[in-house]
Amino acid sequence: MANKTRWIKSRIRSVNETKKITRAMYLISASKVKRLRDRLDSTRPYFEKVNEFMKDLILHGIKTPHILFEGSYKEGKKKIGLIVISGDKGLCGGYNANVLRSTISLYENLAKEADVTFFPIGVVGRNFLVRHGYQVEEDFNYQTQSVSVKFARLISQKIVKKYYTGEVHEVYIIYTKLVSTIRQEVTVKKLLPLDKTEFGIEDDKSDEMIIYEPDPVSVLDIVIYEYIKGIIFGAMMDSYVSELAARMTAMDNATKSADEMIQKLILKLNRERQAVITQEISEIISGAAALK
């Protein structure tokens, strides 16, 4: 009986220690979510301007076919690049599993008619893809928690260069969009070739003429890097905030589960104590009766 009581007390202490950790992780994630959302909001106006400029350039400047819209594929087997943004760590509910499930589903559809190469951002996603034998770009190794405009620029330069040289004919990005702190959605977006309807352009005919120096095509070849950089940066930020929000929810649920477990253990401990007291009282009564 005494051994069982000691075991329950030890179990309560253990669960309490775990609860402290999950509570701390919840608070850290909550703090980071707010900070990163503020950071994302502060950079959004710049990339919105880039998007507006791209729209004006397409509508009023680009009047001839261009590889960024027409595509670089001519013949043979098509080559497709998938940028996959996952987390760097676990303990975030189904966040990583949802991203990878959607990734493999998309891969299975695309791989029927094309060679698919993965460009993973995030340790969990990269390890998963390498472990299961998928074709992964070797020199493409970025962590989600290192999200910055600098990294987004490096990634956009690599991706656009591979598109121009024909190493990939299409590029998709898979990331997690934050709907709310308790809801995140895996999103797939086609990066290249560009789709004019993405800019709200149904008909690119326009009577207005804008002069671009040195010429519209040269300007587009420069601005495309800023445009792709903006999408990648936004996707990385959205994904990282989603990971933290998922971790917040997971750690909050874990803390609540720990509270429930502690209450059950305390109830069990009290019952054991009551049983000990009842037994001792019974022994005293039996002893007193024997003396009479």
Curated annotation (Swiss-Prot):
Q: NCBIfam families, from UniProt?
A: ATPsyn_F1gamma
A GO molecular function term, named singly, is: proton-transporting ATP synthase activity, rotational mechanism
Q: In which domain of life is the source organism classified?
A: Bacteria
The identity of this protein, by name, is ATP synthase gamma chain
**Which keywords fit this entry according to its UniProt record?**
ATP synthesis, Cell membrane, CF(1), Hydrogen ion transport, Ion transport, Membrane, Transport
GO CC annotations, alphabetized: plasma membrane; proton-transporting ATP synthase complex
Family assignment from sequence similarity: Belongs to the ATPase gamma chain family.
Keyword Lipoprotein recorded? no
The SS bond pairs are: none
Give the protein's function: Produces ATP from ADP in the presence of a proton gradient across the membrane. The gamma chain is believed to be important in regulating ATPase activity and the flow of protons through the CF(0) complex.
Instruction: Please describe the quaternary structure of this protein.
Output: F-type ATPases have 2 components, CF(1) - the catalytic core - and CF(0) - the membrane proton channel. CF(1) has five subunits: alpha(3), beta(3), gamma(1), delta(1), epsilon(1). CF(0) has three main subunits: a, b and c.
